[in-house]
Amino acid sequence: MKQTNVNWQPENLEDDLIKLIPLIKLDFDRIFAVAADPLIWEQHPTKDRYKKEVFQLFFDSAVASGTAFLMVDKLSGKIIGSTRYYDYKPDNSSIAIGFTFLAREFWGGLYNKSSKKLLLDYAFQFVDKVYFHIGATNTRSQLGTMKIGATKVNEFEKDANGEKQLHYEYLIEKRDWRK
């Protein structure tokens, strides 16, 4: 299944709980209001992403990717986080999902699972494999990724903040995806 011309930032990803809205440059203040919580980043490789100047780099990269989303709670209309696709490889029929963060009040519930289901359902229309790359110290994200059916398939070092840090790669294949 090789498709090279895929829109990885569709405007219609939503369910009863959450809506994913394409991230644009004008969204900075609204999403930074969520990201400014230091506890969100305590397990991430970039632990100081709650600082405006550090988050600005993350945000600019997300907007430039053309594959990032705001996560919106449909009940309240509140912006609760962000996520994105990245690393699309048509020849490998794969893409990655990541760079996800959620406001703490939405941790441990249905919101992460709901957003991942929307992203996975969409991705599996075009690819056979979806990867997740998670810092080795980010046990919260590792557990959340395993809860949706991903399996750890690799360990690798990645440069983060000028130093090599251990990361884990998780995989969900289309044939194994349960809706």
Would you name each region that the model predicts?
Residues H133, T151-H167:
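Conserved catalytic-core motifs of GNAT/GCN5-like acyltransferases
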Residues L70, K78-D87, A96:
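Conserved beta-strand in the GNAT
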